[in-house]
Design a protein with these regions (language model features):
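C-terminal binding/interaction regions
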Residues: 108-174
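A short glycine/serine-rich beta->alpha loop
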Residues: 30-37, 68-76, 147-153
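Acidic-glycine-rich active-site phosphate/pyrophosphate-binding loop
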Residues: 21-23, 50-67, 133-140
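Phosphate-handling active-site elements
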Residues: 53-63, 91-110, 174
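Conserved phosphate/anionic-ligand binding catalytic regions in large, soluble enzymes, centered on
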Residues: 76-87
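Polybasic, low-complexity association/targeting segments
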Residues: 17-38
């Protein structure tokens, strides 16, 4: 038996997002960095910073984004902050009807535009490139968060950039 769950966007929430000011985006960017500094992974930080705008509780957002940290479970593939950005875009530009090619195209267009913008800012959207590490799976145990961790990694900046880019994207009027 197959069950289908359709997400019905809340028009009120979308209107709030479309009216979000630069200052409100900056607050969400700051929240994303703060969430990251609390120990959540890069993907969780970006997605959790915007989850409330889509009626998603923080715990649910953290669960949904967990596996994307460290470039997808420390595989060092697509940066987790970028994946978090894409999760937000999936909520903002949903493609829930399999026959609605227009919705899927709109989502993919937003994904490609924001990925290009992130790459222009950071040089890559691949975790291994950003960390200057070999492109191979690592020990699955997350690194300890300490001053050295934050000093040697661009992750905090990646979180801020991704949160800024997605904030700008979801406030555009089309």
């Amino acid at each position: 038996m197959v069950f289908y769950c359709y997400y019905q966007p809340d028009i009120y929430l979308f209107s709030l997002l479309n009216q979000m000011t630069e200052n409100e985006i900056e607050i969400r960017v700051g929240n994303a960095v703060e969430i990251f500094e609390q120990g959540y992974n890069c993907s969780q930080a970006v997605f959790m910073a915007y989850a409330d705008a889509y009626g998603i509780e923080q715990e649910t957002a953290a669960k949904l984004a967990t596996s994307f940290g460290g470039g997808m479970g420390r595989l060092r593939e697509v940066c987790g902050a970028v994946s978090g950005m894409f999760l937000v875009l999936g909520m903002h530009y949903p493609a829930t009807d399999t026959k609605d090619k227009t919705a899927k195209t709109k989502n993919y267009d937003a994904v490609q535009r924001t990925a290009k913008e992130f790459k222009a800012e950071m040089g890559s959207y691949i975790c291994a490139d950003l960390l200057k590490k070999k492109h191979q799976p690592e020990n699955p145990e997350p690194s300890d968060r300490n001053d050295k961790y934050y000093a040697l990694r661009p992750c905090r900046r990646c979180v801020a950039i991704a949160a800024q880019i997605v904030g700008n994207e979801i406030t555009k009027q089309y």
